[in-house]
């Protein structure tokens, strides 16, 4: 058996097109969704992420409200701006790019985001609702939502399945486990203290890896015919046959490559379907952010 490779780029593009079509319909009625992105400082990775999000907004017809602060902004000033955005009727989603500088309490800032504009899904109220039966939050975190979306679009049967989640982070592991549980999967969360890990993983019809350990999941940990979703993103050096690092002619530095938490080449011979790294879960995050922003706007417009 050779697994179907789940093309996250293609699925993300389909979602963006769906969002764009709905946004176009809303704008024709004079209703424009708006997403505010708040960034503090100029970390290259944060700037890159925020720029990508703002560009996607423009492509889909979503109003992009960019808010930039210097690294030394006071917590009070940042807090005041977030509260202002929370009360702005033209803003339907607020994203505060993390990490924030050390002198700012991230929890205080994130808690100031209106729960009906918490498109990242990290407000304690939304997280709490995610864990309560019958209390579906308006938003769930984007990457876990992307995992579920990929499974759905691949035709995976979630209800009644055995799902194993490797990792218990607040960003991916816990929320994806709760989303799977909410879809009536029988869920096991594994972590560094889990005993007989390979045996537990082999029971999974759906295996989600989100631990940040390169190629940790090997073929002997995967049940034949399982759906394997690799959320991990790890950087490894590119090596010559003799084991020495390959040096880039352009930069003079060792070349690196991205790999996931799953040994892709081995596991693809066992699984029914698998996400690659890169090109699997990664592209889904911004697509689901746009979908959450649209959802927030529809909620504000009384259309949900």
Predicted segment positions?
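Positively charged, low-complexity intrinsically disordered leader regions
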Residues: 1-31
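Short beta-strand segments enriched in small/hydrophobic residues
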Residues: 32-41
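Short beta-strand elements in bilobed, periplasmic/extracellular small-molecule ligand-binding domains
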Residues: 35, 57-72, 187-189
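Short beta-strand segments
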Residues: 39, 95-99, 166
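Glycine-rich phosphate/diphosphate-binding loop of Rossmann-like nucleotide-binding domains
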Residues: 40-55, 134-231, 236-245, 254-268
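Short, well-structured alpha-helical segments in soluble
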Residues: 77-89
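Anion-binding alpha/beta catalytic cores of soluble intermediary-metabolism enzymes, centered on
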Residues: 93-159, 200
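Rossmann-fold NAD(P)-binding glycine/threonine-rich loop
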Residues: 107-114, 118, 127, 232-301
């Amino acid at each position: 058996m050779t697994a179907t490779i789940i093309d996250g780029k293609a699925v993300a593009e389909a979602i963006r097109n769906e969002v764009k079509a709905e946004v176009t319909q809303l704008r024709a009625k004079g209703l424009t969704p708006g997403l505010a992105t708040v960034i503090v400082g100029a970390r290259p990775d944060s700037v890159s992420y925020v720029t990508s999000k703002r560009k996607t907004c423009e492509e889909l017809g979503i109003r992009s409200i960019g808010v930039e602060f210097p690294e030394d902004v006071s917590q009070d000033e940042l807090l005041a701006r977030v509260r202002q955005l929370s009360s702005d009727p033209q803003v339907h989603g607020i994203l505060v790019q993390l990490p924030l500088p050390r002198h700012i309490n991230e929890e205080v800032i994130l808690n100031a985001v209106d729960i009906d504009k918490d498109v990242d899904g990290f407000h304690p109220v939304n997280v709490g609702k995610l864990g309560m039966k019958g209390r579906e939050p308006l938003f769930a975190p984007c990457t876990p939502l992307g995992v579920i979306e990929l499974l759905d679009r691949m035709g995976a049967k979630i209800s009644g399945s055995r799902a194993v989640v490797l990792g218990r982070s607040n960003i991916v592991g816990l929320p994806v486990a709760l989303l799977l549980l909410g879809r009536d999967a029988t869920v096991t969360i594994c972590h560094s203290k889990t005993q007989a890990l390979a045996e537990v993983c082999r029971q999974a019809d759906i295996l989600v890896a989100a631990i940040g350990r390169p190629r940790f999941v090997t073929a002997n940990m995967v049940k034949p015919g399982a759906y394997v979703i690799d959320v991990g993103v790890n950087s490894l050096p590119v090596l010559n046959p003799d084991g020495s690092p390959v040096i880039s002619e352009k930069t003079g530095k060792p070349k690196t490559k991205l790999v996931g938490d799953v040994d892709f080449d081995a596991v693809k011979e066992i699984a029914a379907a698998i996400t690659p790294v890169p090109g699997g879960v990664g592209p889904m995050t911004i697509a689901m952010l746009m979908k959450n922003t649209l959802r927030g706007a529809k909620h504000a417009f009384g259309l949900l």
